[in-house]
């Protein structure tokens, strides 16, 4: 809600259930107005999850690629969804087949990752880093999973850079919420996590191929992302 429409959440209840059919002035609609763009949502969730299908339509999404459109490989996590590496590989294949981002098409595409949710238990055959026994298990599991997702994103961005349209493409990497949640305070108090785990609930905001180059090391709010991206679209 904040990232796509610049609105603060409700004090109680969920907007996706209570106000999903409101009129929202979103990034998707702004892109359509500026570039006559087509908007895609790619997620391995079902459209019924958090009422994503109805919300996406209200946000101006033209095409939803969801749960039943992906092959269930690398399934893990509480709800047995596909891992982010397989997700991005299949997204790449959909681009190559022309299912999304057709040749000559101006697009707004939103890719929703999944693997970075608790309990952070990555299958052994997908693990590519290890940590010493002194690191608490929950912290090690989280960093292992984060590394897996980071690499999946990196591989996908490397693919995008091979496309001729990349020079006119902005890639935004952002989190909708922080990762450790209730585990954070426990890990912050552990001496082994000093320098690894922050006591602050932070999310990333990275813009690649931006028309304006800068690094901002102070704190900003998620509510600032929407106007920042609107400004970069101009």
Q: At which residue positions do the language-model features occur?
A:
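Solvent-exposed soluble domains appended to multi-pass membrane proteins
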Residues: 1-234
